[in-house]
């Protein structure tokens, strides 16, 4: 067997130190962003003026607006967006807080009742000769870790939103000095969010494990069963963040586009459009706060899944701390690798032209993957015993440390492949999107047909990538292999999030430039940043969906072993009915979220039309629109509409587990995983392709694009219709599906002891 080279003390120092370095790096990047001043006060001395960058660039007065006014205007708009986003999140968190308390009580009652709230120790499920802590302890600690995960998730989302709204106007102002400066500001702000989230998630989990260990001592099984609540808390908050934020952002977006662009023929982000502030707020609450919570949830769950599966392995039974915390050590090294990778974008290379933006972001993915592969090899060598035993459904499996390294590496590279395939299908630099744009010649119908076909086709390679990584990792290390493969895919989360958050920040920067009446040249620069951000956002969604599939499977494995099922037989009717119902759930969920966006957008369209018709001088630009009403419509609609889809996901495992038992529930989990992944990938890519086909026609960068006509042509109108249909697909139902897949699995895992003892009431009666 042989113990790990890295001593336990080394592990206990390494993990928190890496987390603290991550947080320090995030604060340092934030400090650099904050050096861009949003006040228009000039220093008297010429040296100070040079230092503040006033002499770096010529102030463009093409629009007759002097520098002072532009800065003040940008600050005002930024303030409005920040206030809108903060008020939405506080309203959302009020409702989510009530849910958290109610669900925490439920966890305590269900898990406590497993042994009738007894406080005496019980025989362990994996080894009857040993005694484990009572179920009541698991109930209390699971409840605490659920609340911890939930709060960490909410804080992550909120901080991300604050950073994004802090950086958007600064990116706009930097765009006056050139595209390179604006890129660095947007990217640094994204990095602040990425590192804060990754380091926070790791640190809180590590502290929780150490505090719980004081009580649990050597009972790893009980300890990590209780820690699973952390993943459940993180993901259930992410569900409301993603669904609520997604409905908010798309209701505003669709409403603003339909009335502004299609009916009134005014440009995007025109300050005369009443829904324009709501649209920009939506970018922050959906694409930043929602996405941050989502990836944090995946991160927490993949760690929990790996720890639960490992707790009944040989190093779990021999109490080897370093080997046990291998998943956390991988994440710690991930933070250091991402730190190095970020410096490539901000310090080692400079962006001088528009065409260098997208390659720079893609390089981030490649560099982080290559460096991480080396990092994981080192970690596997020092933190694992040369060989160890994993118990898989009652069967022992001997695993070598190099095999576990391959499991992590396979997940890591599968993530990169999924990212690049997504980019190929959604970037307008390649033929798939250009074909979709070309199909607009014959109207919106052919555009929709081509877009749907593209989405379905884009599922093929990612599914093979996921399938191969599952096969390889399962062959080498059973369910533990799959859990660490998911962790491998998420190990470069800090870089992934930085790239992801960069998109909405640039999008907002463009909106602010338009509203502040800045020159055409600046708008072109922010548009170029935004177009690259659009593709990288699609790559980010690919990562989130791919990792969700692996995480869900790992959680499924942990659930099956916790619920003491030895085999899941598809031929038994109990399992098969679960399978069919599970496969239907993603469709039901998508129907709810799509309809919610539609009905919220209807209200928005009516309000925007009402303002254009009743406010005199609005179209001429002499009167100000009532932005606040539109923000309120989006807020109210999204809060009301996020409850039914949320209830569907949270209640399904409970209802199925209690009424039909663990076998049917295992069928439901497998079914939802299989169909959910396919719909999520195709929905995200279809929406992304329609969006970029529209941008391709608008930019008119190539001969082919120019032949499809300028803005306002029939081709362009057909493209706008496709884009509007794709909005809820790519930003609401697609990305929320990966939470459905993971959340049902992690919830089943948390409640597994209860379902195993009290579940299947219907089958007991009949």
From Swiss-Prot:
Regulation acting on activity, per entry: Inhibited by excess pyrophosphate as well as excess Mg(2+). Inhibition by ATP, GTP, and CTP is reversed by increasing the Mg(2+) concentration. This suggests that the substrate is a particular metal complex such as MgPPi(2-). Modification of Asp-283 with DCCD abolishes pyrophosphatase activity.
Positions bearing the site annotation: Important for proton transport: 242, 287, 294, 301, 731, 742
Membrane topology term: Multi-pass membrane protein
Disulphide bonds in the chain: 124-132
Keyword Transport (UniProt): yes
An example molecular function term from Gene Ontology annotations: inorganic diphosphate phosphatase activity
Family: Belongs to the H(+)-translocating pyrophosphatase (TC 3.A.10) family. K(+)-stimulated subfamily.
Database matches in NCBIfam families: PRK00733.3-5 (NF001960), V_PPase (TIGR01104)
Comment block on domains: Has 16 transmembrane helices and a large cytoplasmic domain that contains the active site.
Name of this chain's protein: Pyrophosphate-energized vacuolar membrane proton pump
């Amino acid at each position: 067997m042989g113990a790990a080279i890295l001593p336990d003390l080394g592990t206990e120092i390494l993990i928190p130190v890496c987390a603290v370095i991550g947080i320090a790096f995030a604060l340092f990047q934030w400090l650099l962003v904050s050096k861009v001043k949003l006040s228009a006060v000039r220093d008297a001395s010429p040296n100070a003026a040079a230092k503040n960058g006033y002499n770096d660039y010529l102030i463009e007065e093409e629009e007759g607006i002097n520098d002072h006014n532009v800065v003040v205007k940008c600050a005002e708009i930024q303030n409005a967006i920040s206030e809108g986003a903060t008020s939405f999140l506080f309203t959302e968190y009020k409702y989510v807080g009530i849910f958290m308390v109610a669900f925490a009580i439920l966890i305590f009652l269900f898990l406590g009742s497993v042994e009738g709230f007894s406080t005496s120790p019980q025989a362990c499920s994996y080894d009857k000769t040993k005694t484990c802590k009572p179920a009541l302890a698991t109930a209390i600690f699971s409840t605490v870790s659920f609340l911890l995960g939930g709060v960490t998730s909410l804080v992550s989302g909120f901080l991300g939103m604050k950073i994004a709204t802090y950086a958007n106007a600064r990116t706009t102002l930097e765009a006056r000095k050139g595209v390179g400066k604006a890129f660095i500001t947007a990217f640094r702000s994204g990095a602040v969010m990425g590192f804060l989230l990754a380091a926070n998630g790791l640190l809180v989990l590590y502290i929780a494990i150490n505090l719980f260990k004081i009580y649990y001592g050597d009972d790893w099984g009980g300890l990590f069963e209780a820690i699973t609540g952390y993943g459940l808390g993180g993901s259930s908050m992410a569900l409301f963040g993603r669904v609520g934020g997604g409905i908010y952002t798309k209701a505003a977006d669709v409403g603003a586009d339909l009335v502004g662009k299609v009916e009134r023929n005014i440009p995007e982000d025109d300050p005369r459009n009443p829904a324009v502030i709501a649209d920009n707020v939506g970018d922050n609450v959906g694409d930043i706060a929602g996405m941050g919570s989502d990836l944090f949830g995946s991160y927490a769950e993949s760690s929990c899944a790996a720890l639960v599966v490992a707790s009944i392995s040989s190093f779990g039974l021999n109490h080897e701390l370093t080997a046990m915390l291998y998943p956390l050590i991988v994440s710690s090294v991930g933070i250091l690798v991402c730190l190095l990778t970020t410096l490539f974008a901000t310090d080692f290379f400079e962006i001088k032209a528009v065409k260098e933006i997208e390659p720079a972001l893609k390089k981030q993915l490649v560099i982080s993957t290559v460096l991480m592969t080396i990092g994981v090899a080192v970690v596997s060598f020092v933190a694992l015993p040369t060989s160890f035993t994993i118990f898989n459904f009652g069967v022992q499996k001997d695993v070598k440390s190099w095999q576990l390294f391959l499991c992590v590496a396979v997940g890591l590279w599968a993530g990169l492949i999924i990212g690049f395939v997504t980019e190929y299908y959604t970037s307008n630099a390649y033929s798939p999107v250009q074909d979709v744009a070309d199909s607009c010649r014959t109207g919106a119908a052919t555009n929709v047909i081509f877009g749907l076909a593209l989405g379905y086709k884009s599922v093929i390679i990612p599914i093979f990538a996921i399938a191969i990584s599952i096969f390889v990792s399962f062959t080498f290390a059973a369910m533990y292999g799959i859990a660490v493969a998911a962790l491998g895919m998420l190990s470069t989360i800090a870089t992934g999030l930085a790239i992801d958050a960069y998109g909405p920040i640039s999008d907002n920067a463009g909106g602010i430039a338009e509203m502040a009446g800045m020159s055409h040249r600046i708008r072109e620069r922010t548009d170029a940043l935004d177009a690259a951000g659009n593709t990288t956002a699609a790559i980010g969604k690919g990562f989130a969906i791919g990792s969700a599939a692996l995480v869900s499977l790992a959680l499924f494995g942990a659930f099956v072993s916790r619920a003491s099922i030895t085999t899941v037989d598809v031929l038994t009717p109990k399992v098969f009915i679960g399978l069919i119902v599970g496969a239907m759930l993603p469709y039901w969920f998508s129907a709810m979220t799509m309809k919610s966006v539609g009905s919220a957008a209807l209200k928005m369209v009516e309000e925007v039309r009402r303002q254009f018709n009743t406010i005199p001088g609005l179209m001429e630009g002499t009167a100000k629109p009532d932005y606040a009403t539109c923000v309120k419509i989006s807020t109210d609609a999204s809060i009301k509409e996020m409850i039914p889809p949320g209830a569907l996901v949270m209640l399904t495992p409970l209802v199925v587990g209690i009424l039909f038992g663990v076998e049917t529930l295992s069928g439901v989990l497998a079914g939802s995983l299989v169909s959910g992944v396919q719909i999520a990938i195709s929905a995200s890519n279809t929406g992304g392709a329609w969006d970029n086909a529209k941008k391709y026609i608008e930019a008119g960068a190539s001969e082919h694009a120019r032949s499809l006509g300028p803005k306002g042509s029939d081709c362009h109108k057909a493209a706008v219709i496709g884009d509007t249909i794709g909005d809820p697909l790519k930003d609401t139902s697609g990305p929320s599906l990966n939470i459905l897949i993971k959340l049902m699995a992690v919830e089943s895992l948390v409640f597994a002891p209860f379902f195993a003892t009290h579940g299947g009431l219907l089958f007991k009666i009949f």
